[in-house]
């Protein structure tokens, strides 16, 4: 069974994690602390194929890593996890380079638009990983009839 590590405990990370468990993957969701309430609640709802840990533990665990963190924190989170943890792994980046510092609505982080992207910066930070940028404008809540 493939092991997936997810960085981020928000609605995007937990929704993707739940779907992957339904497809028979083992999933560890990572946050700053292993005792994060959101991640522990998610584990309780998803059974034995779900686990929670730190960013570092999720990066260690996963053969494939999903980055579901806020774009303004993504690079720092990869550093917290340990850059070498991503060597020879596929990193699926779903983050958006949004700045929430002035409240809602957020704005784009200027250095990651026009001539550069957050995914390119992640790839530079993780030269031994295969970074794939996708799903960043797909609503994770699904369609409603």
Would you name each region that the model predicts?
Residues 9, 31-32, 69, 94-95, ...:
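Fold-independent oxyanion-binding glycine-rich loops
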Residues 45-51, 127-130:
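A short helix-to-beta-strand connector/capping loop
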Residues 94-141:
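Rossmann-fold NAD(P)-binding glycine/threonine-rich loop
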């Amino acid at each position: 069974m493939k092991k997936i590590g997810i960085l981020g405990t928000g609605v995007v990370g937990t929704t993707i994690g739940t779907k992957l468990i339904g497809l028979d993957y083992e999933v560890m969701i990572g946050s700053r602390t292993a005792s994060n309430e959101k991640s522990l609640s998610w584990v309780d709802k998803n059974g034995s194929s779900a686990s929670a840990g730190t960013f570092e533990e999720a990066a260690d665990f996963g053969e494939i890593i999903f980055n579901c963190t806020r774009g303004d924190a993504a690079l720092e989170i990869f550093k917290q996890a340990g850059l070498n943890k991503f060597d020879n792994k596929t990193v699926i980046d779903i983050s958006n380079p949004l700045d929430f510092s002035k409240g809602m609505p957020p704005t784009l982080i200027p250095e990651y638009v026009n001539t550069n992207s957050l995914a390119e910066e992640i790839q530079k930070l993780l030269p031994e990983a295969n970074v794939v940028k996708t799903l960043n404008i797909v609503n994770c809540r699904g369609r409603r009839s």
